Amino acid sequence: MLWQALRRFGQKLVRRRLLELGMGETRLARCLSTLDLVALGVGSTLGAGVYVLAGEVAKEKAGPSIVICFLVAALSSVLAGLCYAEFGARVPGSGSAYLYSYVTVGELWAFTTGWNLILSYVIGTASVARAWSSAFDNLIGNHISQTLKGTILLNMPHVLAEYPDFFALALVLLLTGLLVLGANESGLVTKVFTGMNLLVLGFVIISGFIKGELRNWKLTKEDYCLTMSESNGTCSLDSMGSGGFMPFGLEGILRGAATCFYAFVGFDCIATTGEEAQNPQRSIPMGIVISLSICFLAYFGVSSALTLMMPYYKLQPESPLPEAFTYVGWEPARYLVAIGSLCALSTSLLGSMFPMPRVIYAMAEDGLLFRVLARVHNGTHTPIVATVVSGVIAAFMAFLFELTDLVDLMSIGTLLAYSLVSICVLILRYQPDQEMKNGEEEVELQEERTLEAEKLTVQALFCQVDSIPTLLSGRIVYVCSSLLAVLLTVLCLVLTWWTTPLHSGDPVWVTVVVLILGLILGISGVIWRQPQNRTPLHFKVPVVPLLPLVSIFVNVYLMMQMTADTWARFGVWMLIGFAIYFGYGIQHSVEEVKNHQTLPKTRPQTIDLDLTTSCVHSI
């Protein structure tokens, strides 16, 4: 009795949502074109990173070799982007990595992914709103901050911000109202701001190459000491590296690349528009690939221009581009760049807010969150309750919190989502086509009979018995992918915590790494020998299983770099989420409701959506 109860409980945690023909139908308005998705991806990705991150990484971690940092980070992001693109073509639904996890690895992992995506978007929205407020305040001479500091102070350091940001609060609430009006209206604003941002960045790149000097990529310690003597400072080699193009060496490039990786976070918001894109199978993969390419070219060009215009050790991390134009004597250009930064932060803010309610909507639609959050406005066809609730929470956090200590927490959620999407692509590529036509019980019975007919042999592991996937080959890949995820996590843990003995050639730890790599290669070989699903898609990840595995390794390795405090905060957030899931979601899940319903066997089982409201509207 106890064993059966535990077995049923375990089945609830790993139950998966089947890919159904009805998943292409939606209650949201299909009004977003490929251009809209590219503008959304570029706007949400090409935000604070290009105006703030470039100066910080160049000065403190990489110097002129920041251009290589962005190249490495772009390659890492492309791996995740390719996986997102295939799933966007295969599963055209709203919810991004949440939905991808649901149809592949099960309900508990799907809830975990969705819950962390909500965390990432809320923190991202609040922090960008504070950055927008600070940039605007700096443009007008810091009058807002000086006034608030003189009247209202929050005396809780490391917990709350120094002062409440009324401007950031109003900004988030204003954009929340814009999103409530409809995706098409907010898409128009996104395209305008993104266009202005690209024009300003184009001006920065061209001006930088005109006014830049190649000698700034060949600086020596003597140049740095001369600058320090002019400012009565101390000449210290540690503070500027060893000079040249790579002043901080290979270690600096890798550390800088890890930071620059987060500058590409944001393209995943494209994947949440599956129910609002006019042609999701084509638009989503194209939007992701094109937006990542544009962002890389912009980051590469701006970082090159920035480090050519002035010595990297003179950069101001808070406002590197305006200060660079002041340094070369182009003072009026400072204000043009400041306006561009406001446009960039505006699109980045909207890009963070856009997917937030749609992930909540998708989870509520599936019953994992409260059903009221899935309510859609009849006039604008937008998830109005989810939009308002998420906007109010983000506005409250922007009002009270500085959020600098929560950036790593946001990154954990994003990297976890990236890793799960890569696992999902790997698993689903090798699964047989399944359609739920005669009820879930009949499908499960058919699967059990098929598995009994198939036998697990050595030949099934290393030789293709069939040219198309079977239930047995699909199960083999599922188990092997789970083992690979565990092994890659252990490998990243060893490489992070036992770096010194590995560098010194300790035979014990070197043997451990070699054994883990051998197991990874062997299990990967088993997956490689299984037949792949041949369903025609507009886009598929090339070189499977290699690229998804590399993506998983990179993401997990970056997660291992987080501090203990960050993991503690992450644990608190997950406790809140699990309380909601086990207290409400597991009993009200759509899949749970299906299991308790008695449906006629002749009736197709699909998602009940109001198709009369899935119309395309424009302005």
UniProtKB/Swiss-Prot annotation:
Membrane-spanning parts: 37-57, 62-82, 108-128, 163-183, 192-212, 245-265, 286-306, 336-356, 383-403, 407-427, 476-496, 508-528, 541-561, 570-590
Extracellular side: 58-61, 129-162, 213-244, 307-335, 404-406, 497-507, 562-569
Molecular function terms from GO: amino acid transmembrane transporter activity; basic amino acid transmembrane transporter activity; L-arginine transmembrane transporter activity; L-lysine transmembrane transporter activity; L-ornithine transmembrane transporter activity
UniProt-listed Pfam families: AA_permease_2, AA_permease_C
Membrane topology: Multi-pass membrane protein
Reactions accelerated catalytically: L-arginine(in) = L-arginine(out); L-lysine(in) = L-lysine(out); L-ornithine(in) = L-ornithine(out)
Residues bearing PTM Phosphothreonine: T606
Activity regulation annotation text: Inhibited by high potassium ions-induced membrane depolarization.
Post-translational modification (record): N-glycosylated.
Key words of the record: Amino-acid transport, Cell membrane, Glycoprotein, Membrane, Phosphoprotein, Transmembrane, Transmembrane helix, Transport
Expression across tissues: Highly expressed in brain.
Cytoplasmic side: 1-36, 83-107, 184-191, 266-285, 357-382, 428-475, 529-540, 591-619
Source species, domain of life: Eukaryota
Biological processes, Gene Ontology terms: amino acid transport; L-arginine import across plasma membrane; L-arginine transmembrane transport; L-lysine import across plasma membrane; L-lysine transmembrane transport; L-ornithine import across plasma membrane; lysine transport; ornithine transport
Compartments, record wording: Cell membrane
Keyword field contains Transit peptide: no
UniProt KW Glycoprotein keyword: yes
Cellular component annotations (GO), alphabetically ordered: plasma membrane
Residue numbers of Phosphoserine PTMs: S618
Glycosylation site residues: N232
Similarity-based family: Belongs to the amino acid-polyamine-organocation (APC) superfamily. Cationic amino acid transporter (CAT) (TC 2.A.3.3) family.
Function: Uniporter that mediates the uptake of cationic L-amino acids such as L-arginine, L-lysine and L-ornithine. The transport is sodium ions- and pH-independent, moderately trans-stimulated and is mediated by passive diffusion.
Protein name in UniProt: Cationic amino acid transporter 3
